[in-house]
Structures are given as structure tokens and as C-alpha cells.
């Protein structure tokens, strides 16, 4: 995934055990040892598998690099909960999303986001969205804002299935997408619901959207 290993920290018993293969693959980097309690303190949870690795982040991709050949992308706009970000990435990897764009409030490398994603943050190309959606239009994308408004269309509307390149925009927990983002979108899309339920958690809504709005022939 382009992340350069810098150092390893593991329980001493794992140096010749579970960590041996990892140490060999990482090459000539420092290997430190510590007690299990220390590893748990650093990670924030007790399940560590006994090995931690510090890595250098690669240089961020440009939007053009990761979106030029993409057909379905997701824009995570203002989502701050690490659990939701991790879950969205896992669904994106499983359901055919080609790239993820994030606003600065959303960090996929938060340790909880990485854990919840089951490592999917290292599988799906992602980068920061620091401009308006006009750049997506320049790359040939139509935008679909997931929001409940008086003028939103159902997620199963046939028009959406015909779009060769579609950017699905998911908003923050609670407030959802801003009025400006909704006004700028090519489509405003809602998920039909029953039993007087009017909304879903953003991660759950993302999974529904990714499946329903998948690219034509993507499941063949």
C-alpha cells in the first residue's frame, strides 16, 4: 500500500515466533520489545496480536491520480466518528468503490478507523478533497448527494444506474450535508424507508448506496 516500515515493537516472545516472518519482510529496521500492557496502552485496546509497526505515510495522491480511471467514488464530507469512517471504508472495499475522497475532518488512519475497516483503508485509494466539487465534474463525474429533501429522488431511480461515473457524497453524523453541497449536486438521493424511520447511520446508509449505485456490470 506504499507505507514504509520504520520500526517494530513487539512482545519479546514473538521475536522468534509470530513476529519472525514480519521482521524478516520489513528488512533492516529497528525492532523494540515491550510488555503486552505497554502495547495495549499504545493501541488503546488489548487485542494487538503482539506486534506493532510504525510506518511513514506515503505522499498523498492527487484527485486526478485516483479518480481518472474510477467509475464509482465516495466523498466523505465532514464525518468525524472514526468508527463510521472505518465502516465506510470496509463497505467501499467490498462493494466496488474505486476511490475515497475526504474532507479534512475525516482521518482514515485513526487507529480505530483502521481497526474497524479491517485494514481496508490500505486497500482503497484515498486522498483529501480540498476544493469544490467542480474538479469532479472536470473529471467527468456526476455527483449524488445522499440527503432527504423535498426534491430528492429514490436511490433505485433508473437514471442513476446509467451514469458511467458517479461520485456518492455522504454527510456528517447528525446534520448531514450542507445546503450548499446539496444545491451543487447533480442528484439528491434518498433511501426509501419503512416504519416511519427517516434516517440511517451514515455507515449503514453508505453500504446501501454503494451496492445500489454500483457501476454497470461491476458484479460480473
PLM region descriptions:
Residues 53-55, 91-95, 105-108, 112-122, ...:
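Structured adenosyl-cofactor binding patch, chiefly the S-adenosyl-L-methionine
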Residues 18-56:
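Glycine/small-residue-rich loop that forms an oxyanion/phosphate-binding "nest" at active or ligand-binding sites
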Residues 1-4, 11, 26-33, 54, ...:
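RNA substrate-binding interface of SAM-dependent RNA methyltransferases
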Residues 50-54, 117, 163-171:
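Short basic, glycine-rich beta-strand/loop surfaces that mediate nucleic-acid
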Residues 19-23, 130-134, 182:
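Short amphipathic alpha-helical segments and helix-helix/interface helices
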Amino acid at each position: 500500500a506504499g507505507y514504509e516500515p520504520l520500526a517494530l515493537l513487539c512482545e519479546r516472545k514473538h521475536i522468534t515466533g509470530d513476529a519472525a516472518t514480519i521482521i524478516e519482510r520489513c528488512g533492516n529496521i529497528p525492532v523494540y520489545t515491550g510488555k503486552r500492557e505497554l502495547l495495549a496502552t499504545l493501541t488503546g485496546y488489548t487485542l494487538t496480536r503482539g506486534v506493532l509497526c510504525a510506518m511513514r505515510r506515503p505522499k498523498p495522491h492527487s484527485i486526478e491520480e485516483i479518480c481518472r480511471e474510477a467509475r464509482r467514488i465516495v466523498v466523505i464530507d465532514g464525518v468525524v466518528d472514526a468508527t463510521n469512517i472505518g465502516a465506510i471504508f470496509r463497505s467501499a472495499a467490498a462493494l466496488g468503490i474505486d476511490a475515497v475522497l475526504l474532507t479534512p475532518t475525516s482521518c482514515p488512519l485513526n487507529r480505530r478507523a483502521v481497526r474497524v475497516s479491517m485494514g481496508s483503508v490500505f486497500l482503497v485509494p484515498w486522498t483529501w478533497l480540498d476544493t469544490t466539487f467542480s474538479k469532479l465534474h472536470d473529471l467527468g463525474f456526476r455527483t449524488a448527494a445522499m440527503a432527504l429533501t423535498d426534491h430528492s429522488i429514490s436511490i433505485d431511480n433508473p437514471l442513476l444506474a446509467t451514469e458511467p461515473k458517479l461520485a456518492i457524497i455522504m454527510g456528517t453524523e447528525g446534520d448531514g450535508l450542507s445546503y450548499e453541497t446539496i444545491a451543487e449536486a447533480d442528484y439528491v438521493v434518498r433511501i426509501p424507508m419503512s416504519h416511519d424511520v427517516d434516517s440511517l447511520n451514515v455507515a449503514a446508509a453508505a453500504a446501501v448506496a454503494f451496492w445500489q449505485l454500483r457501476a454497470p456490470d461491476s458484479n460480473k
